[in-house]
């Protein structure tokens, strides 16, 4: 009857459900599943028209196992930095027009305050040193 409730037509159906939280808990008790809590690196937004570049950078970083978040919205850099500090991000990536053209984003370590402009290839290793 569930299909009829949502789709207003009868259709044969079969289903199954598991309690995901219970499954994860059971796996953690058996020490076969560990949740690694990582804080995301934040990519700061300078121009919404560059979203494709931000997403490409995020894809590269996530593919390398780095938790990454693109700043959700359009705000001045100060607000974006406040957001990164609020979520306790270990670092931010400044990837504005000049950085996109040069292919060298600026990585700012939020713990030390140091920042450097580096190639995307080097970015992964530098972030891993920070996190």
Where are these regions (language model features)?
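TRNA-recognition modules of translation machinery and tRNA-sensing kinases, especially anticodon-binding
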Residues: 1-131
């Amino acid at each position: 009857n569930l299909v009829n409730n949502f789709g207003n037509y009868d259709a044969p159906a079969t289903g199954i459900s598991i309690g995901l939280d219970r499954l994860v808990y059971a796996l953690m008790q058996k020490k076969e599943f560990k949740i690694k809590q990582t804080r995301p690196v934040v990519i700061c937004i300078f121009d919404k028209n560059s979203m494709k570049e931000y997403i490409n950078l995020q894809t590269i970083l996530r593919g390398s196992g780095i938790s990454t978040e693109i700043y959700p919205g359009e705000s001045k850099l100060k607000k974006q930095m406040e957001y990164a500090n609020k979520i306790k991000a270990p670092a931010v990536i400044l990837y504005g027009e000049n950085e996109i053209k040069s292919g060298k984003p600026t990585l700012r370590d939020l713990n030390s305050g140091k920042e450097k402009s580096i190639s995307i290839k080097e970015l992964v290793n530098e972030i891993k040193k920070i996190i």
